[in-house]
Structures are given as C-alpha cells and as structure tokens.
C-alpha cells in the first residue's frame, strides 16, 4: 500500500472485506459518494478499504491510458495487501471506471473467489467475459447515459442481479444533477450484504 492514499476500516476477526474502487475524475476516496459507501460498509461490521489510483494523486482527470496498466498494477497491490491481512472473502464495489478497471484486472489475473459489484455499468468498456464468474450485482440508474438497466441485463446475463434506480442517471442524480438517489444505492448495498 506504499505510495497510495487510502482509508481502511479493519473489523476485528472479520474475514470479509469490501474494496471500494472509485470512478473517473481527479478525486477518488475523498468524494462524498465513495466516503458514504465506505462508512455504510463499516457499519455492517465488515472491513472496508478504499484507495486512490495514482492518477488522482497527480490530480489528473483520467486514467493512465487505454490499457489501464498503472491501475491494474495498483489493484493487484491492494488485493495482495488484503490477502496478507488474512481476508478470505473479498468483494469489490466498483463505481463506473472502477468496474472497467476491475474487468481489465480479472482479464490479467483471473480469480473466481473475488466477488464484484458494479455501480454504473459501462457496456462498451467493460470486458464482460473476464468478469462473468465474479460479477454478482449491478446497480444502474434508469437514465444512465451509458446503458439502460434492461440493456445491461442482456449483456451481464441472468446470473447477475440488476437493480434499477428509478429516475437516476449514471451518478445516481436527478435531472437537476442533485445526488438524491445515492442513499437508495447505499440501502441496496446494505441489503445485498
């Protein structure tokens, strides 16, 4: 975890950890939504960890490039860390770009023991075949600009649960760009856990 900004809640005797992976933009773990996911998971008496990808530390808007090499390497470092901490049940909660990065990671390092939840699925960017054994849940806004929930269900398949957030966009905001549906997402996450 050297060189990474991260938040880590370690619940004593927990073998479950939730890795929260932020979406695009220059702000990662400091965003209100990622912080709220972290706090919500911690309240379930499970361990939680969220971290910034290096491009956030450099205050850059976007990832390291189309192959996401830096992000894959960082995620590998984080997963290695949680294994050394003794966790045997890992679930990744990935927002948007985090879902894309996760799919690239699993294409390079397949691991059926890690579960994946995607918040805001981007069909043309995610390597669906790489995550078919990992993906358990997608929470998609009804008005997501990348894909409607019904479209995502066709791509992800019947083994994946899809939760539609009515009237929400890709960031779970209303038409005025107010994040009023984010709490609904948090409630669904708690119910899923």
Short names for language-model regions:
Residues 1-85:
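Serine-hydrolase catalytic machinery in alpha/beta-hydrolase-like enzymes
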Residues 89-92, 116:
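Conserved alpha/beta-hydrolase fold motif
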Residues 93-102:
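Gly/Ala-rich beta-loop-alpha elbow adjacent to hydrolase catalytic centers
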Residues 101-105, 127:
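Hydrolases whose catalytic domains are alpha/beta-hydrolase-1, hotdog thioesterase
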Residues 111-123:
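A conserved short beta-strand
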Residues 132, 137-140, 144:
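Short beta-strand/loop motif that positions the catalytic acidic residue
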Residues 142-147, 170-171:
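Acidic catalytic loop of the alpha/beta-hydrolase fold
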Residues 168-182:
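Catalytic histidine-centered segment of alpha/beta-hydrolase-like enzymes
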């Amino acid at each position: 975890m050297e060189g990474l900004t991260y938040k880590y809640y370690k619940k004593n005797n927990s073998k479950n950890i939730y890795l929260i992976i932020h979406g695009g933009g220059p702000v990662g773990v400091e965003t209100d939504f990622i912080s709220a996911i972290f706090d919500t998971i911690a309240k379930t008496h499970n361990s939680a960890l969220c971290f910034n990808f290096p491009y956030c530390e450099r205050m850059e808007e976007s990832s390291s490039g189309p192959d996401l090499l830096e992000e894959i390497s960082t995620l590998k470092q984080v997963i290695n860390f949680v294994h050394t901490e003794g966790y045997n049940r890992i679930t990744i909660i990935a927002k948007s770009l985090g879902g894309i990065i996760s799919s690239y990671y699993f294409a390079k390092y397949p691991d059926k023991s890690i579960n994946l939840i995607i918040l805001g699925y981007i069909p043309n960017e995610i390597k669906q075949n790489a995550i078919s054994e990992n993906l358990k849940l997608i929470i998609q806004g009804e008005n997501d600009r990348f894909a409607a929930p019904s479209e995502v269900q066709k791509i992800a398949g019947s083994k994946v649960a899809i939760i539609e957030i009515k009237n929400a966009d890709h960031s779970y905001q209303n038409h005025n760009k107010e994040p009023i549906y984010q709490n609904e997402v948090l409630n669904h996450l708690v119910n899923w856990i």
